[in-house]
């Protein structure tokens, strides 16, 4: 329990597990991981069965024999931005006669579960299966929030199963060459268990094989059905009520916008999106397929990984930890040196990684993991980095237009689909650039890019033993006003930077030994800051704490 798998920190093409499944336990986070099992043993791919308070984000699962994903018996879980594809169809499942087709994407279950912004592609069945949970008294208890998912080339089964309360909102189902089923949601009312089995169904789009919309999201009765199991009677309640059962705690896009957002940002795409997942995204966009099953001949539904060309090359990369993370605290040396931390902490000392230097609620380790989970680039001072934005906006195909919506510590321009970023001459450290893509249909999405400049953040360089001139700043720690004075008289340029080198306040004022400059820092969050003062050609940097 309490494990974080941060696959975004892997070198090369990232991590790919084969031949054995991955299980996530309680209070854990799994991000940016690939699981491609291949034919052989009847395994699931990625499991959250029985877990509590856990998250899976930006993972890729394919080539599984049983189910690609399962969360039976779980509580309080989230599966998001994950790509599930090419579950092996006629692959010799140990529990079925030879020749039986399977190809299941997954069973989603749990007393409270959120499943959103995922892509399911080229899976024959269980796209998804909603497997309900029953408590010790025999009462249905599951509450599932299923929204903004994209499902492509689902074969003989779309989403079906039994569930207590299901929000099924703004999903995008796109038929493919192997799709044979008409509805996208089938509730199966059981003849056992106490309580209701219901679904709130709204805003879902169904696209036909020829690209026409069978449901543009406005008909909330089209594409849904329910069935009665043997021994069950007609429900006395509304199976499909008109109001959601509970609020969602993530942004819900329209189904059309979700389609574009998901196909722009899904799966294990850091350090990079591998060749397999690039193909899956491309085929979903095109409504195409490349491979057929060697046993069934079904289009897009492969039966063995060899049908799709087998495993691509993942280079073996060896890192010398003595050079990369000398003190083994999870923060690489370059990060600690950039932000004035100690890359040579004693063994077992995690004070640097667990500290929250900028007091924003996230530890230094979390700040590093966020950087690694964001598309990022490195540029030298005085140079410009050029970034092709199309690889971050694959879903926006219709005349995309790009604009820069936020930047600090540099300038950014867009030339067609190329973003050009130039840091300020005086800046060193890390900053982020937000850009927005808008297409001809008015759909828009904002993403951010990280930029690393130099080897040390401005303001966090060690203060030399010999100061250029005396600076007095008080009170320290400070709550509202910081008073700054110097040993000489004259105009001074004052710049305040946070722990990561980002400028948060600049001021020019006249200071002297007897007249202090009054700086209002009340608006700053709690944390460590650096004050850089320049006067008469001299420069000095001091540290202060904002309470």
Walk through the language-model features, giving the residues of each:
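Surface-exposed or secretory-pathway low-complexity segments enriched in glycine-proline
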Residues: 380-422, 447-449
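Extracellular calcium-associated, cysteine-rich motifs in secreted modular proteins
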Residues: 308-378, 456
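Extracellular beta-rich repeat passengers
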Residues: 129, 134, 139-308
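Beta-strand-rich extracellular modules
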Residues: 424, 436-440, 532-536
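Right-handed parallel beta-helix
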Residues: 2-11, 26-37, 50-63, 75-97, ...
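A short beta-strand micro-motif common to beta-rich folds, especially ectodomain repeats
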Residues: 427-441, 447-449
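C-terminal outer-membrane/trafficking sorting elements
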Residues: 462-474, 478-547
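C-terminal edge beta-strand
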Residues: 441-456, 542-545
């Amino acid at each position: 329990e309490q494990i974080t798998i941060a696959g975004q920190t892997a070198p090369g093409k990232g991590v790919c597990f084969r031949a054995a499944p991955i299980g996530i336990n309680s209070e854990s986070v799994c991000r940016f991981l690939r699981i491609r099992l291949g034919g052989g043993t009847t395994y699931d791919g990625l499991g959250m069965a029985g877990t509590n308070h856990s998250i899976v984000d930006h993972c890729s699962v394919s080539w599984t024999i049983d189910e690609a994903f399962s969360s039976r018996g779980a509580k309080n879980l989230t599966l998001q931005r994950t790509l599930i594809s090419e579950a092996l169809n006629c692959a010799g499942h140990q529990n079925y006669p030879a020749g039986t087709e399977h190809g299941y994407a997954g069973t989603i279950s749990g007393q409270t579960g959120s499943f959103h912004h995922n892509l399911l592609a080229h899976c024959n069945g269980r796209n998804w299966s909603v497997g309900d949970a029953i408590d010790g008294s025999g009462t249905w208890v599951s509450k599932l929030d299923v929204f903004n998912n994209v499902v492509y080339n689902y074969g003989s089964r779309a989403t079906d199963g039994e569930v207590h309360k299901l929000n099924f909102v703004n999903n995008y189902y796109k038929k493919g060459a192997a799709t044979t089923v008409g509805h996208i949601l089938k509730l199966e009312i059981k003849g056992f268990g106490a309580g209701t089995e219901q679904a709130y169904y709204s805003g879902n789009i169904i696209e036909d094989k020829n690209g026409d919309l069978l449901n543009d999201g406005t008909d909330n009765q089209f594409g849904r059905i329910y069935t009665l199991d043997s021994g069950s009677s007609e429900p006395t309640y509304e199976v499909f009520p008109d109001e959601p059962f509970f609020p969602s705690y993530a942004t819900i896009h329209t189904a059309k916008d979700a389609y574009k957002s998901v196909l722009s940002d899904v799966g294990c795409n850091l350090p990079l999106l591998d060749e397999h997942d690039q193909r899956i995204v491309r085929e979903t966009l095109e409504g195409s397929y490349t491979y057929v099953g060697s046993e069934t001949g079904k289009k897009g539904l492969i039966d063995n990984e060899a049908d799709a060309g087998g495993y691509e090359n993942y280079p073996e990369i060896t890192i010398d930890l003595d050079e990369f993370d000398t003190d083994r605290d999870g923060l690489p040396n370059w990060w600690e040196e950039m932000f004035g931390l100690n890359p040579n902490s004693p063994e077992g000392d995690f004070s640097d990684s667990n500290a929250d230097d900028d007091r924003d609620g996230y530890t230094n380790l979390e700040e590093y993991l966020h950087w690694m989970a964001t598309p990022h680039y490195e540029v030298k001072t005085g140079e410009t980095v050029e970034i092709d934005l199309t690889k971050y906006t694959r879903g926006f195909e219709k005349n995309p237009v790009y604009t820069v919506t936020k930047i600090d510590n540099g300038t950014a321009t867009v030339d067609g689909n190329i973003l050009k970023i130039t840091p300020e001459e005086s800046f060193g450290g890390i900053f982020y650039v937000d850009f927005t893509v808008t297409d001809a249909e008015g759909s828009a999405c904002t993403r951010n890019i990280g930029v690393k400049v130099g080897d040390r953040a401005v303001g966090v360089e060690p203060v030399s033993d010999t100061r250029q001139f005396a600076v007095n700043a008080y009170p320290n720690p400070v709550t509202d006003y910081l008073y700054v004075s110097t040993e000489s008289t004259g105009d001074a340029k004052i710049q305040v930077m946070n722990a990561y080198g980002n400028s948060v306040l600049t001021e020019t004022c006249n200071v002297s030994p007897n007249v202090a400059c009054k700086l209002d820092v009340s608006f700053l969050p709690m944390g460590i800051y650096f004050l850089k003062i320049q006067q008469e050609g001299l420069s000095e940097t001091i540290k202060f704490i904002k309470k």
